[in-house]
Amino acid sequence: MKIGVVIVTYNRLDKLKIALNSYEKQTVKPKYILVVNNNSTDGTKEYLEEWKSNSTDIEKIIVNLDKNTGGSGGFYEGLKNSLELDSEWVWVADDDAYPKEDAFEIAQKYIEKHKEENLSAICGTVLKSDGTTIDCSHRRKIYTSAFNRISQPYSKPKDYEQEEFEINGFSYVGTMINKEKLTQTELTKKDYFIYYDDTEHSYRLSKLGKIVCIPNIQVVHDAPHSEMSEIVKWKLYYLVRNTLDFIHLNFDEKYFKQQCLEVPFKFKVAVFLFGKDKKYGYKMIDEAVKDAKLGKTGLHEIYKPGWSPNK
């Protein structure tokens, strides 16, 4: 079984180095490692050239983009390139995700044991930066419920006590996708920039085959803890807009109309309770809802990296 790796990086060279090392140390080696460099300015480009020049049994591929396309644009480019490469499964991850050394070995054994099953993807346990605490927010089950609601509950700690459990929503942290399924539906929504690109993609993949979480596959996610008091920043726009766009694309209109009321209400409550610069938060949420109704995606002309209420 041939496994490829797609990593997207932007200005986190120290973490990228750790990530690359974690793939090269796998007990079952990947066929290739493809790194999408989202126009980093911290020496990433130069380091990757040096990394590539040190030849190993693993093929090393670099895709340097001429602008920062966000995580969604980076994963789109990476997965698009993976379709032309020699692998059967593609592992996707951010540059701050470090799989344990036996992650690919466990994945390979599971896939070979269940080769008669219709699998779209498998994924593992995401651990917080302490290496022991499970971050349940990376796996979820999405379904419709009463009163035209869309429920998207995260996985629960008890789920990880099982040998496996089925989901239909994953993050691009510690996920391995069946390449055959990648060819049967659109790739990542590249115009999302950040947030919900992985959820939207995984939900479509779940319509083509099972998505299974295998807790013994473990990935440490070296991501900082976000304080609720920091909710009012540029990323909030994309979280609200893309949540609604995902619903608009994948569910009936009645659900979209209901969620255009429910989703902004929940976020406005969060801004009211925890956020600073509340008026900017409310305005950003309203702008996100308006654009979702128009089907407008892409990088917003105001809410983009570097924006803050005080600028």
Feature-to-residue mapping (PLM):
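A short, conserved alpha-helix in the catalytic core of glycosyltransferases
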Residues: 169-177, 181-187, 191-217
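Glycine-rich, basic loop-to-helix element that forms the pyrophosphate-binding segment
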Residues: 64-85
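Short, acidic, metal-binding catalytic loop of nucleotide-sugar glycosyltransferases
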Residues: 21-31
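Short beta-strand-to-loop acidic/aromatic patch adjacent to the donor-nucleotide binding site
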Residues: 87-96
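A conserved acidic beta->alpha catalytic loop
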Residues: 22, 37-46, 67, 97
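Short, flexible, basic/aromatic active-site loop/helix in glycosyltransferases
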Residues: 142-168
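Conserved donor NDP-sugar-binding/catalytic core segment of glycosyltransferases
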Residues: 102-137
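Non-catalytic, C-terminal membrane-associated alpha-helical segments of glycosyltransferases
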Residues: 234-242, 254-311
